[in-house]
């Protein structure tokens, strides 16, 4: 049997930054009472798909969030066997170091969160390019991300439209370049006007999972047709009868996998661990610190 190994084009390594808003305010257009659970599950599937990329392509995944329930779920994901499961030669420390959660210190919406995350990523890993990725891509496949990042590596800044052609699912900046995120209505055109090279025509329909973000029930149906990840499948199987996220989406939870204050269970197969953050303090930006 012949095994094909993809190597990053031009030797470019990436830090992928994903913003995740408070779960109680997430996916308000998704007309389901369990939308908070689904928002978290889709984010976890997105993160796991990115982490399945080769380490020389994606050096780290940085999630920017202030949501405690998401924080807990991501921290338990940190030490799960899913991180780097297809790369058994990686040490546990090397696997967990790829997943970084930082607080959304601006706390002023999606774009300030991305600016904050990109700045910390560039300070910690100045030789890496930065990619801002939507956190609602439950059908994302690692080869799709590899293909998109390989194309993006040829440009100082690049953008990929969502399935509708008007929004943005991926915005990239080479090492030393400014990301300039402007996510929101008609963001694809806005990013193009700011100088980002459009990858949509080049990639076309070859990356359907990457372009299928989920905001509505119709979007969710299309993602399910493409094939969603294990966390989203579990959330959909649990259905409307699962506990919903409480108003404050608080609580760090315990090893049971449930956030005590929120009542939102971590999707099955994810075990307890520790959380790693990058914090800005007197020692300068980008210092790694562990939290119990």
From Swiss-Prot:
GO biological process terms, semicolon-separated: F420-0 metabolic process
Keywords: GTP-binding, Nucleotide-binding, Nucleotidyltransferase, Transferase
Keyword Nucleotide-binding in annotation: yes
Functional pathway: Cofactor biosynthesis; coenzyme F420 biosynthesis
Reactions accelerated catalytically: phosphoenolpyruvate + GTP + H(+) = enolpyruvoyl-2-diphospho-5'-guanosine + diphosphate
Annotated signal peptide: none
Enzyme class: transferase
Function (record text): Guanylyltransferase that catalyzes the activation of phosphoenolpyruvate (PEP) as enolpyruvoyl-2-diphospho-5'-guanosine, via the condensation of PEP with GTP. It is involved in the biosynthesis of coenzyme F420, a hydride carrier cofactor.
Official protein name in the record: Phosphoenolpyruvate guanylyltransferase
Organism: Frankia casuarinae (strain DSM 45818 / CECT 9043 / HFP020203 / CcI3)
Gene behind this protein: fbiD
């Amino acid at each position: 049997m012949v095994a094909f190994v993809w190597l990053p084009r031009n030797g470019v390594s990436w830090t992928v930054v994903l913003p995740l808003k408070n779960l109680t305010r997430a996916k308000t257009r998704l007309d389901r009472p369990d939308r908070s659970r689904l928002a978290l599950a889709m984010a976890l599937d997105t993160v796991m798909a990115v982490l399945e990329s080769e380490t020389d392509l994606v050096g780290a995944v940085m999630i920017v969030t202030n949501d405690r329930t998401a924080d807990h779920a991501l921290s338990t994901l940190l030490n799960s066997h899913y991180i780097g499961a297809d790369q058994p030669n990686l040490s546990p420390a090397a696997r967990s170091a790829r997943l970084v959660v930082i607080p959304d210190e601006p706390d002023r919406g999606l774009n300030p969160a991305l600016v904050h995350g990109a700045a910390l990523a560039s300070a910690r890993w100045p030789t890496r390019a930065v990619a801002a990725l939507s956190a609602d891509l439950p059908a994302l496949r690692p080869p799709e991300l590899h293909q998109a990042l390989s194309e993006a590596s040829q440009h100082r800044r690049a953008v990929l439209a969502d399935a509708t052609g008007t929004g943005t699912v991926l915005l990239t900046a080479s090492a030393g370049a400014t990301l300039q995120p402007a996510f929101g209505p008609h963001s694809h055109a806005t990013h193009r006007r700011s100088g980002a090279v459009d990858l949509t025509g080049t990639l076309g329909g070859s990356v359907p999972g990457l372009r299928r973000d989920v905001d509505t029930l119709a979007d969710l149906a299309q993602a399910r047709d493409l094939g969603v990840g294990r966390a989203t499948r579990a959330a959909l199987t649990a259905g409307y009868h699962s506990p919903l996220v409480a108003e404050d989406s608080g609580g760090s939870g315990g090893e049971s996998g449930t956030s005590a204050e929120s009542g939102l269970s971590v999707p099955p197969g994810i075990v307890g661990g520790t959380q790693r953050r990058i914090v800005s303090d007197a020692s300068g930006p980008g210092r790694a610190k562990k939290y119990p």
